[in-house]
C-alpha cells in the first residue's frame, strides 16, 4: 500500500527551524543531505517525517519555485511500490511533472495545484539519531 512518508516545509533558516522542532515537539533528526540546489533535513515524530528544505541563495529552479517564494508548505511525498507505473498514471491523468527528466524523487502538480512527490519504497529510513521523540501525555 502506498503511504505518505513526509511533509516538506520550505524554510529560510535550516538550523533555527530544526532547533524549534527538536525543542518544542521532540522530533529526532533522521538525516541531512545536499541535493542539487538545496539542503534537505528530515526530522521525525516516529511515524511521519517533516522534511525541512533550504534552497541555495539565488536558486530559480522549477522545483524551488513550485510552491511559491518564501517559506511555505512545499510538497508532500508518497512512497510507491513501482515508480514507473505511478509516474505513468500521473502523466495519464494530465498532471504537470515539475522534476527534470530522470530525477528521483519525481515532483508533480496534482489536480488543484498541490505539489506532490513520489518516492520509491524504502527511500526514507527511520532515525539513526540518539534522541527519541517525546511521548505524548494527557497533562493539562
Name each model-derived stretch.
Residues 3-12, 41-44, 63-140, ...:
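Vicinal oxygen chelate
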Residues 33, 66-68, 97:
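Short Gly/Pro-enriched turn/cap motifs at secondary-structure boundaries
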Amino acid at each position: 500500500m502506498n503511504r505518505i512518508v513526509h511533509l516538506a516545509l520550505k524554510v529560510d533558516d535550516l538550523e533555527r527551524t530544526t532547533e524549534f522542532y527538536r525543542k518544542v515537539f521532540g522530533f529526532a533528526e533522521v538525516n541531512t543531505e545536499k541535493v542539487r540546489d538545496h539542503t534537505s533535513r528530515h526530522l521525525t515524530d516516529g511515524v511521519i517525517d517533516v522534511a525541512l528544505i533550504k534552497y541555495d541563495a539565488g536558486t530559480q529552479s522549477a522545483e524551488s519555485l513550485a510552491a511559491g517564494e518564501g517559506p511555505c508548505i512545499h510538497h508532500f511525498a508518497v512512497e510507491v511500490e513501482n515508480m514507473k507505473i505511478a509516474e505513468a498514471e500521473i502523466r495519464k491523468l494530465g498532471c504537470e511533472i515539475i522534476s527534470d527528466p530522470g530525477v528521483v524523487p519525481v515532483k508533480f502538480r496534482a489536480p488543484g495545484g498541490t505539489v506532490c512527490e513520489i518516492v520509491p519504497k524504502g527511500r526514507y529510513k527511520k532515525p539513526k539519531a540518539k534522541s527519541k521523540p517525546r511521548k505524548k501525555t494527557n497533562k493539562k
